[in-house]
Amino acid sequence: INSASADAAINLLPENFIVKAIDRTGPAVVRINTERLVTDTSSQELLLKELFGIDTLPRQERKEVLSGQGSGFIIDADGVLLTNAHVVDKADKVTVTLKDGRVFNGKVQGVDELTDLAVVKIDPKGQNLPIAPLGDSAKLKVGDWAIAVGNPLGLDNTVTIGIISTLDRSAAKVGIRDKRIDFLQTDAAINPGNSGGPLLNAEGEVIGINTAIRADANGIGFAIPINKAKSLESYLAEGKKVPHPYIGIGMVNLTPEAAKENNNDPNSQYGIIPEVNGILIVNVVKSSPAQKAGLRRGDVVVAVNDNKVSDGQDLQAIVENTGVNQSLKLKIQRGDSLLDLKVETAQMENLS
């Protein structure tokens, strides 16, 4: 086959969906550089104070600029960006660089640490901005295409591809128990610097925000579903605190086998507990909704709103989805007795 025939054959190949997806959304993906000024006291001074109680004056304080980098994407013509909270939280300076080379100062409008979401605003000053189209993460199925875009390790405009490996992977399973989010799992390569960048579907719509990886494995990355981000974006853009309900308990999952093992241990810290499937309350926060409702350490939650529960992550999700100042009916196993208690959720900011 001659070169002319080869060129003609190549020209007949259809443009693949990845190219189309990146052409559609890639220009709206940005690099975010951050700077944070920190003051550090010399280690020698701290050692003297710790060992001998010597408090030297004046303090030899060093000011150091910590730099960070991540990704984000523009969602409207006014310059609103979505990214991860851990990319921009506590930053003193935020610089946003577009794919076309334009550079803007960014202002952090709002941060929500519990979902690791943040909104950053740039001033387009009359310039046109590329906008990333947002998809519907509720329509995703395991096996759907997933395209990750961002700036891993400082390598701008990097594209990797995989599939949606799992839906609704709990934060606890990911290994970040302090978050209130169920993640999309993907095998599209995600690396440091990808954080805050978009995960796209085959049409180039944003279906997630790349957030985390498992350091001990390859091909396991996690993204916040875009529907979650859409539901919170208005709070963050306006600088409002995102409402997160809580009831105020510490808990562990309980099985009859685990309860029996506990009850056979004379040194058990929980005493005798019911040998049932449920969620064992290991502590109750003072002045919390749970305490006000009469919940106690050693109680076992076996149902919520007449639906059986046996996993603390499920209970946490129910509380989160219920909203603030709403009632939940908990069925409690306390010793040999079954009790119905009503708990009214409260805003987590009231926890102090």
Language-model segments: residues:
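C-terminal recognition in membrane/secretory proteostasis and scaffolding
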Residues: I1, D7-I10, K20, S71, ...
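Glycine-biased strand-turn-strand hairpin within the trypsin-fold
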Residues: N2-L81, D89-A91, R102, L117, ...
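Conserved active-site neighborhood of the chymotrypsin/trypsin-like protease fold
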Residues: L12, S67-Q69, I74-N157, A217, ...
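Residue-level recognition of beta-strand microenvironments
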Residues: I32-E35, A77, K90, Q109-V111, ...
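Catalytic nucleophile loop of clan PA
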Residues: F73-I74, A189-I209
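Short pre-catalytic strand/loop immediately N-terminal to key active-site residues, enriched for Gly-Thr
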Residues: P130-G135, L184-N191
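Chymotrypsin/trypsin-fold serine protease catalytic domain
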Residues: N151-D178
